[in-house]
């Protein structure tokens, strides 16, 4: 039975208290956010695609945690089986530490270890991940020719069928891993000792609570900190009104659903190319709301249909209010949507307006999202995470995809509530 894994080791490096709580008080964890779930799904999808780069492998994924020990034995047997050339999710254990290696490939009389990442670059955390895996592999006496990180090539442009040889790039981290081995051995011994203690280590809250990842025990450790979120928001109204202009202009509220797939879907696209896969337009012509919705979730190749529809539907308004983390004008210009000067000047990203007007509240310090702003302005209300829409949009379940229209409308109505409240309409 193992004591540590790759994830718990990395957790210990970030905060020893988090490691202790995870192993001894897991029920204190925060609920997994929709954003985290979306990231996990993206990583899993890229990992499965990476396996096709090395076809014909054996999947060693355990069916349950109780099967880890069995899979460790099977993995080691496969290393000496000449008929086995590739394994996926191979399971190794050394020094009470268990790892599951994304891909391991026979390389002559040795093996090449590969860790897959869905990012466009390599971070220090990824390097440490690989160094730990190297430590366990060497401890298991696996003859290694190299250990590499396999990640997305930012310069790849799709032209026809997906070219995995061009989509992925490799970087050896063997030299780095070898230099880190003594540190890892000491850390593992230290972490195992911490886990055995009767009480969690006394560690004050600080930057480690959010770096490099937001800690899943954030709510527990911060529960006694005075709740600044109870204080009302502040804003520079003079700047706000200058940016808004005439409050009585005819206004439409636009909620755009962008998709940035790690793997390009269409010819001419690069990894993480952004395009519109759905939108909701909300307006009020007198007494009743007017709502127009569109999406192409059943066929993403139809995404360009959104552009003329948006141009047509927004043409009759003096102003279009949206809320987006990206530069919305630049994004729409890429789709040739804003070639018309008549439409270009109408688009107003209310997120940028609030930031320029120094909108301040405890909730938006680390997350200037629509949800955080809404709950700052209306402290007695809540709004779901936007990542819920992303997850449902990418779901294979038609019922979950059908929820998108309603959620886009709800976000749009929340934006209108914020707008009217803040500018006192």
Q: Can you annotate each of these PLM segments?
A:
Residues 84-90, 94, 98-102, 113-116, ...:
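Conserved DEDDh/DEDDy metal-dependent 3′-5′ exonuclease domain
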């Amino acid at each position: 039975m193992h004591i540590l894994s790759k994830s718990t080791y990395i957790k210990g490096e970030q905060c020893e208290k988090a490691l202790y709580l995870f192993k001894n008080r897991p029920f204190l964890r925060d609920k997994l956010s929709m954003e985290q779930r979306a990231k996990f799904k993206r990583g899993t999808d890229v990992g499965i695609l990476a396996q096709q780069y090395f076809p014909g492998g054996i999947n060693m994924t355990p069916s349950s945690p109780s099967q880890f020990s069995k899979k460790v034995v099977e993995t080691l047997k496969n290393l000496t089986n000449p008929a086995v050339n590739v394994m996926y999710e191979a399971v190794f254990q050394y020094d009470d530490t268990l790892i599951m290696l994304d891909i391991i490939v026979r390389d002559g009389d040795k093996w090449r270890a590969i860790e897959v990442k869905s990012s466009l670059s390599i971070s220090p955390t990824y390097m440490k991940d690989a160094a730990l895996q190297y430590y366990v592999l060497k401890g298991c006496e696996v003859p290694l020719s190299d250990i590499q990180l396999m990640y997305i090539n930012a310069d790849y442009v799709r032209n026809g069928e997906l070219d995995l040889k061009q989509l992925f790039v490799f970087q050896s981290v063997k030299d780095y891993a070898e230099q880190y081995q003594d540190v890892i051995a000491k850390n593992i011994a230290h972490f195992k000792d911490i886990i055995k203690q009767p009480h969690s280590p006394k560690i004050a809250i600080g930057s480690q609570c959010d770096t490099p990842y937001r800690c899943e025990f954030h709510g527990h450790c911060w529960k006694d900190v005075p709740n600044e979120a109870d204080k009302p928001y502040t804003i520079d109204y003079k700047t706000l009104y200058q940016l808004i202009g005439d409050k009585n202009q005819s206004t439409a509220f636009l909620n755009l659903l962008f998709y940035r797939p790690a793997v390009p879907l269409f010819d001419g696209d690069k990894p993480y190319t952004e395009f519109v896969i759905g939108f909701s337009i909300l307006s009020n012509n007198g007494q009743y709301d007017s709502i127009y919705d569109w999406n192409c979730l059943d066929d993403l190749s139809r995404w360009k249909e959104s552009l003329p529809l948006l141009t047509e539907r927004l043409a009759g308004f003096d102003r279009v209010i949206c809320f987006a983390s990206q530069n919305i004008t630049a994004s729409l210009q890429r789709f040739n949507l804003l070639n018309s000067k008549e439409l270009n000047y109408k688009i107003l990203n209310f997120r940028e307006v609030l930031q320029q007007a120094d909108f301040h509240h405890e909730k938006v310090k680390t997350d200037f999202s629509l949800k955080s702003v809404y709950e700052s302005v209306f402290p007695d209300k809540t709004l779901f995470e936007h990542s819920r829409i992303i997850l449902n949009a990418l779901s294979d379940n038609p019922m979950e995809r059908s929820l998108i229209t309603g959620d886009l409308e709800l976000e749009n109505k929340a934006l209108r509530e914020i707008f009217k409240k803040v500018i006192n309409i």
